[in-house]
A protein has these predicted regions:
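Inter-helical turn/loop segments and adjacent helix faces that build the functional surface
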Residues: 149, 189-195, 263-269
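Active-site activation/catalytic loop segments of kinase-like enzymes and analogous catalytic loops
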Residues: 251-281
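Active-site catalytic-loop/activation-segment of kinase and kinase-like phosphoryl-transfer enzymes
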Residues: 1-8, 155-208
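ATP-binding pocket architecture of kinase catalytic cores
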Residues: 36, 43-159
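Short helix/strand-bridging catalytic loops that position acidic/His residues to coordinate divalent metals
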Residues: 118-127, 238-245, 259-265
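Short Pro/Gly-enriched beta-strand edge/turn motifs at strand-loop
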Residues: 20-26, 77, 202-214
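Juxta-kinase regulatory segment immediately upstream of eukaryotic protein kinase catalytic domains
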Residues: 1-30
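Active-site acidic catalytic loop and adjacent metal/ATP-binding pocket
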Residues: 31-51, 56, 203-251
Length: 281
């Protein structure tokens, strides 16, 4: 793992090359990151060339696994795309700089907000409904604001992968893996001796197709676990874009309604909160 000063030095150099002046990053704080990623917050020394007072620096070390390492390019493109959106549709932080060779991203600092997981854990029934309503509104604004922009996202992805051998194929393979997992899930259930009705098989087949094409397509981070959603200034922001892209937006809705099935600590939702979420979306 690179030591902290080296990662921060790289980030300062990236910002200097992009914005001019001589950027300095101090008061470095290590943050929680997903997987092997190193994530830091740093304060920016006052500089007329750069208006942000603090930034978040993320480094994703190469693992040697092509499929795993391809996530960095996807995340970079997703942040490029999200940054180009209007503030009302933008799902999360702004991309301030990056270096694909060093595998470093620099994004705006959202501050010390609480995660959706923390908010749900502390909520009573009424607050729970308000939280889900606010989440539905945030998702709906992102989906509505990006529904017609898939070509723009694809152009950015093509530019990023064009000069990198096999990179485009790896991105397509990662998308197909999501569809493949549905088939695996059906096989696992069947292997456990559970009878699968024909209607469920048909639904699973339809879902596989809608992951890759058709449906109500919009931009989504697609990893909507409550610890990847942060609330600041009374608004929700979505983090971690390693699986981001254009997919049927109803997958995001279903993921919330199903109580975040990939996040075992999620609080069960009551019917009123679920209805409020869907109505707001």
């Amino acid at each position: 793992m690179a030591d902290t000063p080296e990662v921060i030095r790289v980030a300062a150099d990236i910002l200097t090359k992009r914005y001019g002046g001589k950027q300095e990053l101090v008061d470095v704080e290590r943050l929680d990151g997903s997987g092997v990623a190193e994530v830091y917050r740093a304060r920016v020394v006052n500089n007329p060339f750069f208006q942000h007072r603090s930034v978040v620096v993320k480094r994703s070390p190469a693992s040697g696994d092509e499929l795993v390492d391809a996530a960095f390019l996807r995340e970079t493109v997703a942040y490029q795309f999200a940054t180009s959106l209007s503030p009302s549709a933008r799902p999360g932080p702004v991309l301030l700089g990056y270096d694909t060779a060093q595998r470093v991203l620099i994004i705006s600092d959202l501050g010390d907000g609480r995660t959706l997981a923390d908010a749900l854990r502390a909520a009573d029934e009424a607050t729970h409904t308000d939280i889900l309503r606010k989440l539905g509104r945030a998702l709906g604004m992102m989906h509505a604001g990006t529904a017609d922009e898939e070509d723009a996202f694809n152009v950015l992805l093509q530019r990023m992968t064009r000069s990198r051998p096999n990179s485009a194929n790896l991105q397509k393979l990662r998308d197909r893996l999501l569809s493949h997992r549905i088939r695996i899930g059906v096989n696992v259930i069947e292997g456990a001796g559970v009878a699968i009705p024909a209607e469920v098989r048909i639904a699973a087949s339809n879902v596989q197709s809608r992951l890759l094409r058709g449906g109500m397509r919009a931009f989504t981070p697609f990893d909507l676990t409550p610890d990847n959603i942060v609330e600041t200034d009374s608004a929700f922001h979505f983090l971690d874009y390693e699986w981001a892209g254009y997919r049927d937006a109803t997958f995001d809705v279903a993921f919330v309604v199903a109580r975040f099935p990939a996040f075992l600590a999620a609080q069960p939702f009551n019917a009123q909160a679920t209805e409020a979420f869907v109505d707001a979306w």
